[in-house]
Amino acid sequence: MHGDAPVDAPVSGAMGYLLTMLAQDVGFPVPKGGASALTAAMVRRTGAAELRCNSVVTRIGVENGRARSVHTASGETVRVRRAVIADVSAPALYQDLLPAEAIPRRMREDLEKFEWDTPVVKINYALDRPIPWRSKSLCDAGTVHLGADDDGLLRWTTDMSTGVLPTRPFMLFGQMTTADSTRSPAGTESAWAYTHLPRGIIDDASADTIADRVLAVLEDHAPGFESALVGQVVQRPSDLFASNANLHGGAVNGGTAQIQQQLIFRPTPGLGRAETPVEGLFLGSSSAHPGGGVHGAAGTNAARAALGQHGLLGPLRKKVTSSLLELVTR
């Protein structure tokens, strides 16, 4: 569910171990007041940095193999002093923003085989009472994995890989007011569910069908759920993509999380690092290692790589990295 690896795929069980370790170590915290509170907190820590919203970047200028400028749709040109960290998908960076001659032939060929993760459908619910779970142990859980036993999970993953809309979707369900009482008035519940569509199926009708089936599964596990609903909003793959160009076709992880596109294979076979073949340009999105999630790791890796090219060992680190990149991409 958290990735798009079938249960029988190589190392698919690693995600379960990772989540279990995280739960034991730090739990699954949520921002008080909603997801926007996390963005607001980051803005408060930017100090003297200049933030520009709604400024669409159309091109990254490259001169003598180095990123030198960033160009926007409004015609503005921003000169690059130290580095560019691109928080965009790998296909968007290498196929849309950079000149073709700046990308090694082998990397261009590898990008033709880039694989997206499966589309997501997210349904947001407002309920006028707590969720009437059959199992009372779920009443205090912030996050619930719901909808399939072992056999059901196998059926669901088979449907995902064969292009069949699951009749009983497996889902992740979040009880937001249970986790954060500021999300809705006392005695009510703000919640959401998300599940996947089979790869390549992103039409609105299929998304709406899955949303109806998600509701049926919830009603099975919590009789009276539907009667408690006062509103719901379905975010289809088209809605997700319209709100964030990185969510290509409703894919939220910046590319498949399966082993063929992880670690040193992310986003293409290489070093598994944030550096790109263009000097001074770093990939800091979920298309880079370690992939999607609200963890900031890909951006942190990119920032550290950019800073690491300066200082006492910077020139040596830069030369070694660029030589290795040239070796594996040309």
Model-derived features with residue positions:
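Conserved FAD/dinucleotide-binding core of flavoprotein oxidoreductases
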Residues: 91-96, 126, 185-217
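Hydrophobic, well-ordered secondary-structure elements that form the walls
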Residues: 85, 125, 193, 214, ...
